[in-house]
Amino acid sequence: MENSLFKKSEKKIRRALRVRKVLRGSSLKPRLSVVKTNKHIYVQLIDDSIGKTLASVSTMAKSSKASGLTKKNQDVAKALGSKIAELGKNLQVDRVVFDRGPFKYHGVIAMVADGAREGGLQF
């Protein structure tokens, strides 16, 4: 008999793989990955061709803590989206592939996407 928490985590891994099997980021069009936990939000620009993170921002970063972006809510998520768009513009990145992972495109995930779009990223 399997544990219900094991089943839940297994389903989460399957959802993430289902989304990521069609998404590939490159240096011209990196992958915008969004991960949320119970307390924090992490956003990264990833170049999958070399396996390197180009830029990242989160509610754990020192710059976010200094500007008061420490809680996990929709306002903070939108600010993180605009901040990652600004970092992407500094790297001459204007187009990205959005990777929502195993999460629904709703709430915090949607607000990160909206903030990134308002910041100038296209996807």
UniProtKB/Swiss-Prot annotation:
It comes from the Bacteria. Pfam families: Ribosomal_L18p (PF00861). GO terms for molecular function: 5S rRNA binding; structural constituent of ribosome. Keywords: Ribonucleoprotein, Ribosomal protein, RNA-binding, rRNA-binding. One of its GO terms (cellular component) is cytosolic large ribosomal subunit. GO terms for biological process: translation. Belongs to the universal ribosomal protein uL18 family. This is one of the proteins that bind and probably mediate the attachment of the 5S RNA into the large ribosomal subunit, where it forms part of the central protuberance. Part of the 50S ribosomal subunit; part of the 5S rRNA/L5/L18/L25 subcomplex. Contacts the 5S and 23S rRNAs. This is Large ribosomal subunit protein uL18. It comes from Chlamydia felis (strain Fe/C-56) (Chlamydophila felis). The gene is rplR.
